[in-house]
Amino acid sequence: MGSGYQLLQLPRERFRKTSFLVWVIILFQRAISMPLGIVTNSTLKATEIDQLVCRDKLSSTSQLKSVGLNLEGNGIATDVPSATKRWGFRSGVPPKVVSYEAGEWAENCYNLEIKKSDGSECLPLPPDGVRGFPRCRYVHKVQGTGPCPGDLAFHKNGAFFLYDRLASTVIYRGTTFAEGVIAFLILSEPKKHFWKATPAHEPVNTTDDSTSYYMTLTLSYEMSNFGGEESNTLFKVDNHTYVQLDRPHTPQFLVQLNETLRRNNRLSNSTGRLTWTVDPKIEPDVGEWAFWETKKNFSQQLHGENLHFQILSTHTNNSSDQSPAGTVQGKISYHPPTNNSELVPTDSPPVVSVLTAGRTEEMSTQGLTNGETITGFTANPMTTTIAPSPTMTSEVDNNVPSEQPNNTASIEDSPPSASNETIDHSEMNSIQGSNNSAQSPQTKATPAPTASPMTLDPQETANISKPGTSPGSAAGPSQPGLTINTISKVADSLSPTRKQKRSVRQNTANKCNPDLHYWTAVDEGAAAGLAWIPYFGPAAEGIYIEGVMHNQNGLICGLRQLANETTQALQLFLRATTELRTYSLLNRKAIDFLLQRWGGTCRILGPSCCIEPHDWTKNITDEINQIKHDFIDNPLPDHGDDLNLWTGWRQWIPAGIGIIGVIIAIIALLCICKILC
């Protein structure tokens, strides 16, 4: 026993060395794991509580989902002259790029190619990986020149230029972008399924993506003195026809104006340049509800046949190469008539109507003298390949949404034919006379553009060509980007009954503004019922908590408008709370960064680290969704239809059938009991 005990004992010297080595290892391990700085026992918790205490709460800012929000939500002006004033050049400031995961569908995007007077480029090429914004309703493509007083173009309000999941502080050459800020959305950790793979790439070119249900329309411009105090912007109809832009306007107005000029053969039919100016009396806020662009319903419609096209001046100058030289200036105006007798002219130019706030006004037009030819010098305008839209003469029913989102539309620039060298109003008058006497009018139109594949928004109305339309319009459907008809037939404008019905239909459909859409490379449905939190940029203040609103088809217009107004009011009510929560999250993000070297916030603060600012956004958002479900998703039945089984006296039929069934069951039960007993 004693010998065994002695065998288990270590020599005293070896025991000391072993104990010293063990203590050195323990102290070294504690020294390595000990955070830098003074940490007391009262502030350091030994247990790991990150996943225990904060399991159902936000324990780290890694749960924030980055989202790009467009500045259009603030109601800013989106026309090119107004937008370019928000951008300026600076030197010595390095660009910054921030990535984000999802974004809104933008109503207006921009694409710039600006050169200096010496021919050098003003804007840098995009870095590798920077692609254009993938969801744009209208792309404003601007080409021109300017002084460009600086190295890079920044946003004067501190906002970002949103590209495809990358937001930059500078504008890149030839790359489509939208103005916006980066926000964060609080999301729980997503559940990963091994059988459901995450999409590797979101399609950039929406025209090639048949599932995008969205159509991109490109508007071309020429601009001089870009970046200077006073710039000049021209809307490009074709290579030789332009429209002077001197006041804010909607993209729908430009689309309709383009179609008006093409339909009425008001393009430059020579190598000279023809520039039209728009009369100040013509309201440029025509078109549909442009998402949230101006927060109002548009009811005015631009008809081409009632506009007054007047040539103001023609300057000629013979050059050595014997080419015609000159600058042609034209003015587009109108003068409403005082009585309805002018609606049916016999020898006068065509007549159309203008719908203004539900009121129909008629007017006559005048044009060039018979056989007058527009000639000018050879110009070298900026070249673009896409014009705003083709000629359209089809009529649209706005109350019936499209059931086929994968239709195609035509949109490409096409030069005027050589046969249109002159503008002869005698031919137009004869055409007008035939329109007055027949129900299938034929109007003179420019050649139909070539087709390029486009996808349609299911919210938009499909325009169907009807018999008797012009050959140019019959070549393909009209553009789905407009809820109201842009160019109506002359015979339609001469019929008061048809005009009145169309006016009522337009005023009704215009109240139905499209819902908001969001594109993302992951799951769009994951953001339902959660709050958008403005984060980056001073322009973030005022961005509403829009949430995710899905498309609705077959809606009752009045109830839909009521639901939209109610949701907007509730969203405004949430702004103050959201901003306070934003500041709290910003402070917490800074704390997480500073305490990362000490093991994280939860390791030092314990259960106090859990972020739980009371958020009632989900409760109110649920109420918003309930309103949308009650008033929008479930259309009310038509009580005027007596053939409906659930209206009138027939609504008692199901109840009667149920009562009869109960009586039969009771009788059968009594019979069975009598037989068995």
Curated annotation (Swiss-Prot):
Q: Where is this region: Receptor-binding?
A: 55-202
Which residues are glycosylated according to the annotation? 41, 205, 239, 258, 269, 297, 317-318, 339, 406, 420, 435, 463, 564, 619
For the Cytoplasmic compartment, the record's topological domain ranges are 673-677
Give the Extracellular compartment stretches of this protein: 34-651
- Signal peptide residues are 1-33
Q: Which SUPFAM superfamilies match?
A: Virus ectodomain
Question: Residues annotated as region Mucin-like region?
Answer: 306-486
Intrachain S-S bonds = C54-C610, C109-C136, C122-C148, C512-C557, C602-C609
Q: Which Gene3D superfamilies match?
A: 1.10.287.210
**Gene Ontology cellular component terms for the protein in this record:** extracellular region; host cell plasma membrane; membrane; viral envelope; virion membrane
Residues that span the membrane, as ranges: 652-672
Q: Where is this site: Cleavage?
A: R502, S503, D638, H639
GO terms of biological process kind: clathrin-dependent endocytosis of virus by host cell; entry receptor-mediated virion attachment to host cell; fusion of virus membrane with host endosome membrane; symbiont-mediated suppression of host innate immune response; symbiont-mediated-mediated suppression of host tetherin activity
Which CDD domains does the UniProt entry name for this protein?
A: Ebola-like_HR1-HR2
**Miscellaneous field:** Filoviruses entry requires functional lipid rafts at the host cell surface. Essential for infectivity, as it is the sole viral protein expressed at the virion surface.
Question: Which family is annotated?
Answer: Belongs to the filoviruses glycoprotein family.
Listed name of the protein: Envelope glycoprotein
State the species of origin.
Answer: Reston ebolavirus (strain Philippines-96)
